[in-house]
């Protein structure tokens, strides 16, 4: 990746990462420059304020945000568009999480971040990847970055569902949640293993 190249070349300074499809508004570069001057080593994310998608996709996207928050305790409203300092390269490149999902890797490795809010612009290059299949794959990769946290949270959810099953004298709920979370954890660990192996 470009970040690996910058690390190899021992680049010193600020780094801005953005997509080249037109959706990351270059007009906000000025805001990034101004914000970065306050604390050059503080990571900055550009959080999107709106999405121009069809209603069913918006609903599904909000469901994904809720599910990912439930499992990871992270609410990710930003994508690739971001700023980080060269001093942060060692941390973000210390694992292969960046190959799963760059935004999730930022959220995992940098707890304290500055935020700039900006709408997503219309795509000018390439076809939109906003479909149900790509969203599902994207969500799995995002959550896979936090797979260890997800496993812990899943165990807690299984325990809570076990207690609930005792209260309502039914084991169906407990069994369903147990199997669903078991299957889900296997999927995200396999996905992470596959991508880590390829890098």
Where do the PLM segments sit?
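Membrane-embedded multi-pass helical conduit in multi-pass membrane proteins
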Residues: 151-199
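Catalytic donor/gating beta->alpha subdomain of glycosyltransferases that bind UDP-sugars
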Residues: 90-149
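Acceptor/aglycone-binding surface of glycosyltransferases and processive sugar-polymer synthases
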Residues: 1-6, 14-17, 23-100, 122-133
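Structural motif marking the loop-to-transmembrane transition
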Residues: 52-60, 132, 136, 143, ...
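Short flexible/disordered coil segments
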Residues: 50-54, 75-85, 107-115, 136-141, ...
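Short, surface-exposed, polar/charged, turn-prone segments marking secondary-structure boundaries
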Residues: 43-46, 70-75, 110-111, 141-146, ...
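Hydrophobic/aromatic beta-strand patches that form the interior of the parallel beta-sheet core
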Residues: 16, 44, 114-116, 191
């Amino acid at each position: 990746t470009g970040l690996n190249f910058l690390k190899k070349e021992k680049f010193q300074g600020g780094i801005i990462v953005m997509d080249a499809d037109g959706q990351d508004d270059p007009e906000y570069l000025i805001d990034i420059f101004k914000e970065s001057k306050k604390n050059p080593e503080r990571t900055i994310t550009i959080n999107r304020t709106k999405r121009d998608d069809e209603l069913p996709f918006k609903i599904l996207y909000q469901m994904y945000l809720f599910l990912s928050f439930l499992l990871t305790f992270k609410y990710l409203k930003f994508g690739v568009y971001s700023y980080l300092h060269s001093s942060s390269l060692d941390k973000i490149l210390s694992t292969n999480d960046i190959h799963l999902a760059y935004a999730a890797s930022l959220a995992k490795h940098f707890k304290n971040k500055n935020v700039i809010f900006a709408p997503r612009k219309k795509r000018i290059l390439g076809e939109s990847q906003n479909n149900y299949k790509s969203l599902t794959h994207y969500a799995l990769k995002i959550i896979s970055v936090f797979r260890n946290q997800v496993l812990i949270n899943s165990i807690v959810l299984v325990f809570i569902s076990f207690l609930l099953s005792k209260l309502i004298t039914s084991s169906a709920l407990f069994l369903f949640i147990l199997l669903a979370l078991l299957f889900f954890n296997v999927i995200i660990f396999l996905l992470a293993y596959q991508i880590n192996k390829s890098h």
